[in-house]
């Protein structure tokens, strides 16, 4: 039954909030420490006070015993003279009473005259005859007192009497109280301060633990470990100084780190990932879909700062292999291009069929025949010219779809004569190169549609005849405002920021690809209006990574 009650009490204590448990533990410990200190100081003061009273009483007794007037009065048994001397001494000193006796311990003087002539109490057998001084505590005729007794010697050294100096215990208790009461007050104040500090400490711990219990924190840690292990992306967390605080299995696998995760914790990220700029520079800034290179692996990386209020605790970086994303992107791009081409062709085919139906109804059979032959010939010529000029079939397919799209939008896309592409520049695959060209053309289409000026013509020049692969896209659209030219290639920046939807990604993606290949982008005003984007990508990737990829 006792064990059951103890378990219930312990369970009740465990159910209390963790900061409250900390507060109670510190409070109990503080009370124990203060009680121990109080006991120590009280015992030390008791010893000091007892020793002090004894020394003082004995010194006073010996001074009185050596007084010539006292010696003379004891010899002659002069009660009146002894009373006069004793009364004067008691007025001038702080002892409570003095008793003077003869060599047989018979009282010659006592504060109570009725006690004179009677034997003194609490005498030590044989001490007076031997001339010994001693202390004794007990309840006598004056009450409970501490006494110092010393013999009175005559000129010949013989014991002729005894002096007893007494300090009442009640007086000693008052002295003790005068010291211990303020000391008790100090301890109470100290206990109050410790309670207050304990409460502040408990509140601080609660804030640091974000209001959670240790079990909740342990559960969150386990959940984080499970989340880190289950996420397909690579995850690395670093502190503000660039030291690894967490790394998951997929990150180690992609980066070629064979050791277990715990061995990498606390190591500088610069020793684990090269280059490590994405992990160490401006980690307080959020970054999304950044093309980077970690240990020779091309990745798409994201970064999110970890904060506690205004304090920066570090950052967490997630990344996936760019090859995997490129594969998915290529598949998606092909599907989108296929769907867009089908939609465009369907729209044109419906218009063409409506025209054809009208001509048939009007029995214009010759014109119907000419129309069918002309349409087929135009489409085939475009396809043949694209196949001949552009060796990469994905790029050729993209351009065919963009020509059809421009026609559907009421625009005209011209591929400048002399355009050709025999091979892709190093560092870019078909999907990435198509993304550069496609995004430039999409921006040109949108700019042309948003402007009431211009001839609605978009021109493309693409060539790899020289040392560089040159891409030029010109439109006569709304142009790029001067206020945006210095940051138009930053993520999220767009001339259509006021319109709903996600903007500011296409040019950022273009700049990322061109930067990686050591290329250069220029942005100029077109004549008479619009914009001319020019991109120069070297056929041989330069070793100098300090080249500025964007020239505005």
From Swiss-Prot:
Pfam families, A to Z: HATPase_c (PF02518), PAS (PF00989), sCache_3_2 (PF17203)
One GO cellular component term: outer membrane-bounded periplasmic space
Keywords carried by this UniProt record: ATP-binding, Cell inner membrane, Cell membrane, Kinase, Membrane, Nucleotide-binding, Phosphoprotein, Transferase, Transmembrane, Transmembrane helix, Two-component regulatory system
Regulation: Autophosphorylation is induced in vitro by dithiothreitol (DTT).
Post-translational modification: Autophosphorylated.
Parts of the chain on the Cytoplasmic side: 1-21, 204-552
Domain PAS: 222-292
Subcellular location: Cell inner membrane
PROSITE patterns noted in UniProt: HIS_KIN
Keyword Cell membrane: yes
Residues that bear Phosphohistidine: 347
Gene Ontology MF: a single term: histidine phosphotransfer kinase activity
Impact after mutating residue 478 to A: Loss of autophosphorylation
Catalytic EC class: transferase
Membrane topology reported for the UniProt record: Multi-pass membrane protein
Catalytic reactions on record: ATP + protein L-histidine = ADP + protein N-phospho-L-histidine
EC number(s) on file: 2.7.13.3
Keyword Lipoprotein appears in the UniProt entry: no
The protein's role, per its UniProt record: Member of the two-component regulatory system DpiA/DpiB, which is essential for expression of citrate-specific fermentation genes and genes involved in plasmid inheritance. Could be involved in response to both the presence of citrate and external redox conditions. Functions as a sensor kinase that phosphorylates DpiA in the presence of citrate.
Domain remarks in the Swiss-Prot or TrEMBL record: The periplasmic domain binds citrate with high affinity. The C-terminal cytoplasmic domain senses reduced conditions using a single Cys in vitro.
Protein name, UniProt field: Sensor histidine kinase DpiB
Organism: Escherichia coli (strain K12)
């Amino acid at each position: 039954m006792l064990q059951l009650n103890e378990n219930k009490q312990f369970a009740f204590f465990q159910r209390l909030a963790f900061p409250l448990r900390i507060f109670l533990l510190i409070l109990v410990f503080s009370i124990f420490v203060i009680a121990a200190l109080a006991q120590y100081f009280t015992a030390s003061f008791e010893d000091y006070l007892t020793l002090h009273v004894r020394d003082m009483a004995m010194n006073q007794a010996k001074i009185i015993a050596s007084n010539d007037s006292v010696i003379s009065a004891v010899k002659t048994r002069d009660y009146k003279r002894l009373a006069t001397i004793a009364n004067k001494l008691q007025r001038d000193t702080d002892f409570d009473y003095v008793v003077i006796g003869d060599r047989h311990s018979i009282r010659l003087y006592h504060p109570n005259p009725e006690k004179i002539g009677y034997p003194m109490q609490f005498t030590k057998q044989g001490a007076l005859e031997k001339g010994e001084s001693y202390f004794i505590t007990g309840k006598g005729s004056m009450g409970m007192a501490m006494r110092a007794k010393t013999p009175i010697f005559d000129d010949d050294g013989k014991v002729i009497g005894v002096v007893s100096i007494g300090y009442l215990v009640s007086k000693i208790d008052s002295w003790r109280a005068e010291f211990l009461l303020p000391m008790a007050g100090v301890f109470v104040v100290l206990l109050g301060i410790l309670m207050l500090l304990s409460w502040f400490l408990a509140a601080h711990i609660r804030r640091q633990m974000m209001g959670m219990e240790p079990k909740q924190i342990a559960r969150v840690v386990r959940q984080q470990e499970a989340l880190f292990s289950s996420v397909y992306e690579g995850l690395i967390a670093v502190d503000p100084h660039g030291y690894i605080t967490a790394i998951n299995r997929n990150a180690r696998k992609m980066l070629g780190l064979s050791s277990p995760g715990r061995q990498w914790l606390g190591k500088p990220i610069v020793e684990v990932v090269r280059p490590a700029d994405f992990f160490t520079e401006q980690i307080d800034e959020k970054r999304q879909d950044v093309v980077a290179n970690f240990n020779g692996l091309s990745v798409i990386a994201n970064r999110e700062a970890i904060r506690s209020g205004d304090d920066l605790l570090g950052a967490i970086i997630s990344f996936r292999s760019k090859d995997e994303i490129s594969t998915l992107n290529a598949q998606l791009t092909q599907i989108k291009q296929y769907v867009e081409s089908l939609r465009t062709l369907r729209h044109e085919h419906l218009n063409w069929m409506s025209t054809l139906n009208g001509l048939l109804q009007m029995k214009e059979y010759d014109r119907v025949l000419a129309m069918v032959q002309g349409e087929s010939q135009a489409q085939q010529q475009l396809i043949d010219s694209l196949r001949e000029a552009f060796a990469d079939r994905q790029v050729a397919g993209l351009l065919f779809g963009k020509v059809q799209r421009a026609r559907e939008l009421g625009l005209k896309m011209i591929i400048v004569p002399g355009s050709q592409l025999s091979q892709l520049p190093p560092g870019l695959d078909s999907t990435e190169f198509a993304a550069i060209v496609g995004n430039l053309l999409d921006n040109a289409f949108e700019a042309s549609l948003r402007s009431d000026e211009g001839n609605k013509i978009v021109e493309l020049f693409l060539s790899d005849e020289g040392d560089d692969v040159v891409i030029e896209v010109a439109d006569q659209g709304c142009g790029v405002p001067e206020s945006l030219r210095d940051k138009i290639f930053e993520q999220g920046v767009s001339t259509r920021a006021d319109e709903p939807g996600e903007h500011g990604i296409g040019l950022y993606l273009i700049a990322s690809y061109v930067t990686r290949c050591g290329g250069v982008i220029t942005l100029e005003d077109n004549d008479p209006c619009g914009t001319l984007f020019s991109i120069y990508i070297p056929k041989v990737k330069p070793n100098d990574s300090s080249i500025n990829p964007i020239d505005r």
